[in-house]
Amino acid sequence: MAAYLVFTKEREHDAGAMKEYSAKAGASTAGHAAKPLAYYGAIETLEGPEAQASVILEFPTMEEARAWYQSDAYQEARALRFQGGDYRVFLTQGV
């Protein structure tokens, strides 16, 4: 069953770190079945705290999503995201 990793950027602190994160995070998907469904496009917050941006990645299963998220390559990129901004990240199963 499909699974979705959703990233919501709440605040950016360091544009340089975010640029480097974006490049490394993109490269980290090599060998993983990640399909981008939304990638920093126009966003409109309808409820809750204001969001600046979002990314939605589709994976075939929750296990495959976790495997990418926990991979060494993504964890290296993730450290840059922590420097660059405040995000909320969650994994949800599709129907």
Role assignments for model-derived ranges:
Residues 1-53, 60-66, 70, 93-95:
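Short S/T/G/P-rich N-terminal loop/turn motif that feeds into the first structured element of a domain
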Residues 62-90:
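C-terminal structural segments of small proteins and small subunits
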